[in-house]
Amino acid sequence: MVAMAEAEAGVAVEVRGLPPAVPDELLTLYFENRRRSGGGPVLSWQRLGCGGVLTFREPADAERVLAQADHELHGAQLSLRPAPPRAPARLLLQGLPPGTTPQRLEQHVQALLRASGLPVQPCCALASPRPDRALVQLPKPLSEADVRVLEEQAQNLGLEGTLVSLARVPQARAVRVVGDGASVDLLLLELYLENERRSGGGPLEDLQRLPGPLGTVASFQQWQVAERVLQQEHRLQGSELSLVPHYDILEPEELAENTSGGDHPSTQGPRATKHALLRTGGLVTALQGAGTVTMGSGEEPGQSGASLRTGPMVQGRGIMTTGSGQEPGQSGTSLRTGPMGSLGQAEQVSSMPMGSLEHEGLVSLRPVGLQEQEGPMSLGPVGSAGPVETSKGLLGQEGLVEIAMDSPEQEGLVGPMEITMGSLEKAGPVSPGCVKLAGQEGLVEMVLLMEPGAMRFLQLYHEDLLAGLGDVALLPLEGPDMTGFRLCGAQASCQAAEEFLRSLLGSISCHVLCLEHPGSARFLLGPEGQHLLQGLEAQFQCVFGTERLATATLDTGLEEVDPTEALPVLPGNAHTLWTPDSTGGDQEDVSLEEVRELLATLEGLDLDGEDWLPRELEEEGPQEQPEEEVTPGHEEEEPVAPSTVAPRWLEEEAALQLALHRSLEPQGQVAEQEEAAALRQALTLSLLEQPPLEAEEPPDGGTDGKAQLVVHSAFEQDVEELDRALRAALEVHVQEETVGPWRRTLPAELRARLERCHGVSVALRGDCTILRGFGAHPARAARHLVALLAGPWDQSLAFPLAASGPTLAGQTLKGPWNNLERLAENTGEFQEVVRAFYDTLDAARSSIRVVRVERVSHPLLQQQYELYRERLLQRCERRPVEQVLYHGTTAPAVPDICAHGFNRSFCGRNATVYGKGVYFARRASLSVQDRYSPPNADGHKAVFVARVLTGDYGQGRRGLRAPPLRGPGHVLLRYDSAVDCICQPSIFVIFHDTQALPTHLITCEHVPRASPDDPSGLPGRSPDT
C-alpha cells in the first residue's frame, strides 16, 4: 500500500460532479488541454459513478489542474481534489448476474486468484445496495501487477455464464452503515462519527440516508479518517454498528441518475441543502446568468424546493426560478446571495409549478448581443423524464457554451449564449448526434487539420484573430493522431471561419533545417535545447517542431547511466594512450608500477608526488562531468606521465625484475591472464554493438544521418538568417575532447561506430583524435576510445570491427559464442533446477510439465556479469545483491537471449508498468502465464532461469529508462533496479544488459493435470524435442 501511495502521489486527481452524459473521451481531451484546464497528458481515467479518478503522467500537470479554481464541462461545475491512493486489498466487481449470493461471489474471486497463479486467500463480499455490483475485501494486499492479471483473467472466466468485470478502487472517503444500525437517529450518528475518541472519525462532509434498507452513507472530509473508521468496531446505544466502505458507483441506478442532476433526493440535514445549492449555483455561473433560468426539482411530496441566485448577471438582468413541481400543501424556499444593489433593483426569486413550462421550446441557442434579448432557460423535472443523454455528436453544442464561459484568457472567443430548454415530456428525448435548434438551424461541426507547428503558430501569433471569431466555437485538437481545430456553430459561420483560417495558414511557410552536429536531436529534446529553441522562437517570431527529432534519440538519455563508466581510465585530465608496443593490460601496468615503487623505495627516491595507479572512475553526479574531477590532494597540480619523471635506469631495472618474475609463473596462470585481457577487450568492443532495433534507423533521424528540425514562420521571415542563428547557438554548447597522441591511423570503421554509438563527430588532427558533441557524450566517447586503444593489439588483426560482434568475440575466446547443453534427467543439476521451478509455480504446479532443461553457457557475458557483481558487492547496502529469478519469453527470442543476454531491444516488450527495462519474476507462476511465455506451434513455452543483480532497488513506475533516483544527499545517484513493491517485491526490472546472466532454459508445456506419482513433475521421460 505504501508503494502504491508513493507511485500515485501528486498525479491522481479525484473528479466529482460529473454528469453521466459526458463521454470519457471528452473529459480526457478537456484535461489534456493545457489552455482550458491547465492539465497535460492523461495516463488513465477510471469512472466511478458521478466522478472518477484521473491520473496524469506528470505531477506538475495535476498541480496546475488542482490550482485552477473553476472547471466547467457539459454545463456542470466539476469539483477536483487530490485522489486517495488505491485500495490494494479491495476489488470492485461489475456485471453480476441476478441473484448472486455473497458466498458464490467469494468463490468466484478465489477461482480468479487460482487461475491467475496467485496465492488463494479467503475473501469477504461486502453488502451492496446495487445487486449487479459489489465490493470484495481481501485480507492481504495485491500488487499492481497482480490486479492487472486478475482483470485479464476475469475476461476469460465467467460467473454462471456471465462475464464479470473487475476493477480497482481508491481508498474510501465514505462509509455505509448497514443492518440494524442504519435506523439510528441521524443527529446521534453524526455526533458519534465526528467524535474521534469514540469512533476514530472526524469532520463529516455529508450524511444521507438511502431509501429502504440500503443503509446510511456518511462522507468524511478526509479519506484517512474513513479508512480509520473502517478498521474499528463500533457500538452505539447498546447495538453494534456494521460499517462497510461506500462508493457512488454502488448506488442504485435511479439514485445515480437523480444525483447526476444535482442534489441527492434522499439527502437529509442542512449540509445536503447547502451542497445542492452550491451545485445549482455552479450551473448559473457556467451560463454567466444570461437570461432567466428555471429548474424543476422533481421532488417527492413533503420535500421543499430551493432556488438560488448568485449575484449580478453579465448581460442585463437575470432571473433564476426553481419550480418544485409541488403538490398542494408543499412549501418552497428561496435563497439569495451576492450584492443586490449591483443591478439597480432587486430581482424576483420565486417558485412556480412545472405546468407553466410545458409550452416552451425544446432547445434554442442564440447569441445575446443586446440587453433586451432576454429569455428563460427551463429544465424539465429530472425525475419524470430522466437525464438528457448527450453523445459525441453534440460536442459542438458543448463548445458553444463552455468556451464562452471559460477562463478569463479565452473570454471573447464566443459571445454569451442563452439556452432555453422546455419540458422533456412535451418534446421527447434528445437523440444522439441530432439536435433541432429553434432560431438557428443547421448547427454543424467542422474539423480543420494542420501540422502541430502551424497550429502553435496560430495560437501564439494570431491569438487576437482567433478570439475575433465570436460566433463560432473553436476547440483545439491536440491528440497524437491529429492536430487542428474543431469548429462548432452555424453552418455559414463555420464555413466563413474555415476559409479565414485557411487564409491564415496560407501566410505561414514551413521549412526543414538540417542540423550538421551529431547528437543535435538528443540535445534539442533536452532541457537546455528546449530553452535555446524558445529563445529563438521569441527572437524570430517562429515555431520549431521537434516531431522529426523524436526518433533520433538513442535509448539512453543524458541523465541515465553511462555504459562506459566501468571502463578503466588513466590518471590525469588528458586522455593519454598506451603505445602500441606495450606488453600488458591493466594488470600488467599495475604490476610494473608496483615494482617501480618498490625499487624507488629501496633506492631512497622521492616519488610521492606522482600518481602511479590508474584512478577508478568515480560515481557520476547529475551533471555527469567526470572529466572535471581531480584526485583529492592534487587539485593544483598538472598530472605528469610516470615515464617522464622516473630515471631511465629505474624503468629498465623494473622491467627486468618484472620479466624475471613472470618467467617463474606457471603457464596456466599466464593463459588465464591473457584470456581475461581478451575478455576485457571484448567487453569494450561489445559497447559499440547496436541493438537490432536501433540499428534499423539512422541515429540522428532524417536523411544522410542529419537531424531535421521543422520550423513554421511568416513568409517574410528570412529563414537563412534563422538557420545561421541556430547553428551559432548550437556551436556554443558543443564540447570537445582530445585523445592522443596515437601513432597509428584510426580506422574509418572505428570512427563511424563511435559516432553512431555516442552521437559525436570524430576527426583526426595530426596524431590526435578530436571528439565533438553535446553534454557528457564527448567525454564518454573519449573514455571508450581510450579503452579501445589501450592494451596489446594483434598486429595482423588490426581493427576487425567490420565483422559482427559475435564472430569477433568468438575468435577472441577461441570457442563457441553460446552453447545450450541439455541436462540429463538423472543429474543433480537437473533435479535442483526443476525442484526450484515447481516450488514457485503455486497453483499452476499441477498444470505445467517440464519438457527439458538446458544449461546456457556464455563466457563473455559471464565475465561481464561477474565484474558487475563485484562492483555491487562493494557499494550496495542491501543483501543479497544477487537473486535467482525467472523470465518468460517467446520462442523467437530464445536464440537472441542465448547469444546476447537479456537485451532490452528484444526483451521487456510485454510490460512497461514499472519501467522500460527487462522484467524478472520471483516466482515462476508469473513467468509461465501465456502473456509472458506464449506457447509455440508445438505447445512449448520458454522460461529462463537467471542470476540477476538486483542490488539496491527502488519503486518502479511507468516511463523509467534507468533505475529510480535515490533520495537527496545519498552518495550514489540511482538505485540498481526497480521493483513493483518495496516491501514485498515480486517483479524486478533491470536496465543494464550485463546485470542478468541466463543459466538455464526450461522448456515446459501445459497439461490437464500432472501425475501425482512423479515428484519432479515429469510424467515419464521428456520427449526429444
Swiss-Prot record:
Descriptive protein name: Protein mono-ADP-ribosyltransferase PARP10
Similarity annotation: Belongs to the ARTD/PARP family.
Reactions accelerated catalytically: L-lysyl-[protein] + NAD(+) = N(6)-(ADP-D-ribosyl)-L-lysyl-[protein] + nicotinamide + H(+); L-aspartyl-[protein] + NAD(+) = 4-O-(ADP-D-ribosyl)-L-aspartyl-[protein] + nicotinamide; L-glutamyl-[protein] + NAD(+) = 5-O-(ADP-D-ribosyl)-L-glutamyl-[protein] + nicotinamide
Gene of this entry: PARP10
Motif, PIP-box: chain positions: 831-838
Recorded consequence of changing residue 987 to E: Decreased catalytic activity
One GO BP: translesion synthesis
UniProt-listed PANTHER family: PARP/ZINC FINGER CCCH TYPE DOMAIN CONTAINING PROTEIN (PTHR14453), PROTEIN MONO-ADP-RIBOSYLTRANSFERASE PARP10 (PTHR14453:SF94)
Motif range (Ubiquitin-interacting): 650-667, 673-690
Region (Myc binding) location: 700-907
Modification sites for Phosphoserine: 378, 423, 431, 663, 1011
Composition-biased stretches (Polar residues): 321-336
Recorded superkingdom: Eukaryota
Phosphothreonine, modified sites: 101
Free-text comment on this protein's domains from its UniProt entry: The PIP-box mediates the interaction with PCNA.
SUPFAM superfamilies from the UniProt entry: ADP-ribosylation
Residues found modified as N6-(ADP-ribosyl)lysine: 140, 916
A Pfam family of this chain: RRM_PARP14_3
Organism of origin: Homo sapiens
Gene Ontology CC, one term: cytoplasm
Tissue expression summary: Highly expressed in spleen and thymus. Intermediate levels in liver, kidney, pancreas, prostate, testis, ovary, intestine, and leukocytes. Low expression in heart, brain, placenta, lung, skeletal muscle, and colon.
Chain positions found as N6-acetyllysine: 916
Domain PARP catalytic: 806-1025
Annotated compartments: Nucleus, Nucleolus; Cytoplasm
Modified residues (ADP-ribosyl glutamic acid): 106, 882
Subunit-level organization: Interacts with MYC. Interacts with PARP14. Interacts (via-PIP box and ubiquitin-interacting motifs) with PCNA.
Alphabetically ordered keywords of this record: Acetylation, ADP-ribosylation, Cytoplasm, DNA damage, DNA repair, Glycosyltransferase, NAD, Nucleotidyltransferase, Nucleus, Phosphoprotein, Transferase
Compositional bias per record (Acidic residues), positions renumbered to this chain: 617-639
